[in-house]
Amino acid sequence: MIDRLTLLVLVLILAAPTLAQDNYKLGPDSMAQEGVPQGTVTQHKWTSKKIFPGTVRDYWIYVPKQYNGKTPAAVMVFQDGGTYVNTRRSFRVPTVFDNLIHKGQMPVTIGIFLNPGVIPPTKAGGKPRRNRSFEYDTLSGQYARFLLEEILPAVGKQYKLTDDPGMRAIGGISSGGICAWTVAWERPDRFRKVLSHVGSFTNIRGGHVYPALIRKTE
């Protein structure tokens, strides 16, 4: 006979998927709303020749309907961009931007969604080498330079982007989250707003030192 404790454990295990589904529901800003102008998303590929030479990556550019090509747009950069730009997954950033810009709750903003780089295989049938941790977890100004010297100038050739650091934001999750912080920490003169989803402030590549580093920095 199953004792009561075992029965309770079984009930909780069976109920866990249902509880998880009920734990969070997307709000209206994450849903396409009738009458809200929809921005456009285009996909591109970037081969780095300067900061991360030899790496290739996909990236996406979101341009809101309200962008007029004359007024400089605010900018927000996302690491692991394929996750954030996908309107069928949880973040749905293009949809959220559509709704918030339409309501006047955020400025006209161009979104840049970057996947981490990979190094293509040198032999047929080989697998690409992922560069994510090196790019995201390293505590240096290298990734900030990548954005400022490669990506933003390239996007800036197509769209008019603001130079105001207060109108530039960067975000990411996990290693992409600590990467976002590091960019703003290294270059506060270029990025002033950070969205870090459960950033990996652990000793992957030294991120655990940030609390002490912040305390000691004037």
Describe these PLM feature segments.
Residues 7-8, 18:
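Cleavable N-terminal signal peptides
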Residues 21-218:
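Non-catalytic cap/lid and distal C-terminal segments of serine-dependent acyl enzymes
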